[in-house]
Amino acid sequence: MKRIFLNKLNRDFKLELCKVNKEVVCSIPKSCLSSLTRSLTEIDKMEIVINKYITGLDGKTVLNPLWKEVKEERLVCLNDSEYFVIKINNFKSSENELSVTAYSLEYKLGKIDIALEDIYFYLMTSDEDSYIYNLNDYMYSETGWKFGHIDDSVRYDITDEGKEDKLRLFSSVDKRWYDFLTEDIAETFNCLVVFDTLNKIVLLYDVNSVSENIQIYLSHDNYIKSLERTSSTDDIVTRMTLVGNEEMDIIGSVVTGYPYIEDYSYFANNKEMSENLISALNKYNQMVATRQPIWENLIKLKSEKLETSTMRKNELFVIYEEIRALKSIKESYAFNGDTKNEVLVMAQITEKLDQQVLLEIEIKELEEELIQIQDSIDNINLLCKRETATDENGNLIFNTKTLDELKEFIYCETYSNDSFLNVKDLIEAGKRELGLSCYPSVSYTLDVKNFMSRIMVENFRLQWQGDIGLGDIVILRDDDINEDVLLYLTDYVQKPNEDEENSLEITLSNKKYKDKNIRTIADKLREGSTAMKKLTMKSYVFNNVKYNRINITKEQIGGNI
């Protein structure tokens, strides 16, 4: 993985102003760089301040040559390794300076539309005979970007038998490419999307493989100047209903038989529940975990028996048709008085009838076995439902009081994704989303004393050496709650031209990745706007239906439609 990690917070930056085609126009003094914001999941941002006038070599005040060259949509090349696109120029006449905001080049993907309707994709390969297309080729043709490194666990479904490309269905997509990559692709392939703006390459990393090293202990005694903590339970979820495509059976794919999954660990760990309820939940989870493998084996056995039964029924259908055809042939021979051939055909019919009997017996036995297997599955489902769940001694785990108390901790949300073709993939994705949502979001914004000035030159093994990365774990001493908190480094802002005491701000969060599935008002407005545009485009259809269906006149319809 390249350059996710902050190997050092250096102050030596090389800035070049470029045209849209990346042709270099001129250099930008590093003193103009006001701030550089890096984030694990958001678009990186650069702030540049350019003075209108500068002092020339002769000591006279002259117009800054950069002044007329800095234009929107031009690029800034940073350290010959990445590009930022200029989006905002803010001129302050009172200060005779231009404040420039530039975003990492993938920002432009947020201005390119993608619309898909019932399209199957592999990431890097295709099977067009089966109408499965190559997303890499399609992305390159539409945007000029292509995939680079992809972790095997992202690209492939890996089993004991080997690996095969993951297949995803995108049934209704109408958004921008940046959102499609950072939301749909990141979610359905369980990956972190990283953009190489120098080469216009998209890198996909398994979310579980990205830097989780414990790197540094922060407290007011060493690096912290000031600390602000924000916590919120607005989006907390303990029960998540899973909705896939129409062909997916969620209820039949989970041992509890519920259309949802649950996680009450936050309230249990904080002792907000009674001891009786906590004990019941722990025992319930233990018994579900014990019964899960038994249930999975029964489901597998049922699938095998169903497959065998289907094969035998197909064979029996063929036998029925063969017997019918042979009887017709026999009647023809009998009509023509061909006794010899009639006897031969009779022997064939007898043989087929014997096969028919054997198949009917086997099918009946399979159906009886399937009924028994289904009864066992239903019994385990019953034992895994809260109201009827029992412990190893057959005693009910929950009583009316604990069940009523549990209702106080239900916070529902629906996770919907029709891209998955395998219900297990949908359930795993739902578990990841619930894992992000089942406890409050807590973030810390810190002003930090510059790390680099505190690093000792000697390579003493207990001394922090200055390596820290987005996604790394930081142990934070929060004196207000008198606890050491383990948090992820998710964002940082570097101000290279400030003094060391003010040159770095970092954001820490108990959630490594932000939950992108919580719908905001802006999302709803955008979806509504798109729907209205489509409705307007097809308005003639509705008008025809309204006034001309089945040759009924407008007067006959009246004003009720």
Language model features by range: what are they?
Residues 1-28:
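Polar/acidic, low-complexity leader/linker segments enriched in S/T/G and N/D
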Residues 1-2, 87-109, 153-247:
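Short beta-strand-centered interaction patches in the first periplasmic/extracellular domains
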Residues 22-23, 30-36, 111-135, 153-183:
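Short acidic/polar beta-strand-loop edge motifs in secreted extracellular
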Residues 31, 110-127, 203-286, 522:
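Surface-exposed, non-catalytic interaction/assembly patches
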Residues 61-77, 463-478:
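Short coil-to-beta transition motif at edge beta-strands of beta-rich domains
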Residues 65-154, 243, 511, 515:
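Surface-exposed cap/loop segments at beta↔alpha junctions
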Residues 73-103, 194-196, 222-225, 475-497:
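Short beta-strand and beta-hairpin "edge-sheet" elements
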Residues 100-102, 116, 251-443, 447-561:
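Acidic, low-complexity/disordered segments
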